């Protein structure tokens, strides 16, 4: 029972009869029985009004997709929980599956160029990250970078979108999926996370 609602569709013959509302309500009810209170969804921009009427709020939107959450304060609470840096600040978003000398070198090099370096480790436990859990990857990076005094380590939470989280069922041209995913992720990071922390330099890596 995950936290992302997806594969929601209503046949053309049934549209306009409240089918989407019934489906979403049932999915939310099921998620709640599994202990999931924070829920997210990806959809086409033209569906925003529909999902807003069902209690979801925009996190980020591009011309190809929109990312929504069933809370007005979820993103703010996440941003408030992040340790703040000082001066010129940079950021790295990494998978680290597992943490390698390549990751270490990248972080050391980036940290030498800024006053504070924010490193976000992807929090998801997916098939792609089956070898090392999110917590194991976080701890490996924590131990491997403790000598970098100006490095601030964060869990990505639900607000940095990886390609394994991003669904593509609503995208007609699957070749566009990677671009739309990246655009949405960068929009959310650039419009909310970076300004909240004062980040001006970003590196995004999925080195394994």
Regions inferred by a protein language model and the residue ranges of each:
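Conserved active-site alpha-helix within GNAT-family acetyltransferase domains
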Residues: 44-61
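Histidine-anchored nucleotide/phosphate-binding helix
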Residues: 101-115
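C-terminal "cap" of GNAT-fold acetyltransferases
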Residues: 64-84
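A conserved beta-strand-loop-helix scaffold within acyl/acetyltransferase catalytic domains
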Residues: 1-3, 7-8
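Conserved small/polar residues in nucleotide/adenosyl-binding loops
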Residues: 205-206
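Conserved acetyl-CoA-binding loop-helix of GNAT-fold acetyltransferases
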Residues: 16-29, 104-106
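A short, internal acetyl-CoA/4′-phosphopantetheine-binding micro-motif in the GNAT/acyltransferase core
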Residues: 8-16
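Conserved GNAT acetyl-CoA-binding A-motif
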Residues: 31-43
């Amino acid at each position: 029972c995950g936290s992302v609602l997806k594969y929601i569709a209503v046949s053309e013959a049934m549209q306009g009869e409240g089918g989407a509302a019934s489906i979403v309500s049932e999915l939310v009810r099921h998620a709640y029985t599994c202990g999931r209170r924070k829920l997210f969804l990806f959809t086409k921009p033209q569906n925003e009004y529909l999902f807003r009427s069902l209690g979801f709020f925009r996190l980020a939107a591009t011309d190809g997709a929109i990312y929504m959450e069933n809370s007005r304060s979820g993103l703010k609470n996440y941003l408030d929980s992040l340790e703040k840096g000082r001066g010129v600040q940079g950021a790295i978003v990494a998978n680290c599956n597992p943490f390698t000398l390549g990751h270490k070198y990248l972080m050391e090099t980036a940290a030498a160029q800024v006053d504070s370096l924010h490193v976000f480790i992807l929090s998801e436990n997916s098939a792609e990250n089956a070898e090392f859990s999110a917590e194991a990857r976080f701890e490996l990076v924590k131990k491997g970078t403790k000598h970098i005094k100006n490095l601030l380590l964060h869990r990505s939470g639900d607000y940095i979108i990886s390609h394994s989280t991003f669904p593509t069922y609503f995208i007609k041209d699957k070749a566009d999926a990677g671009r739309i995913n990246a655009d949405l992720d960068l929009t959310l990071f650039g419009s909310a996370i970076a300004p909240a922390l004062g980040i001006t330099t970003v590196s995004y890596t999925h080195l394994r």
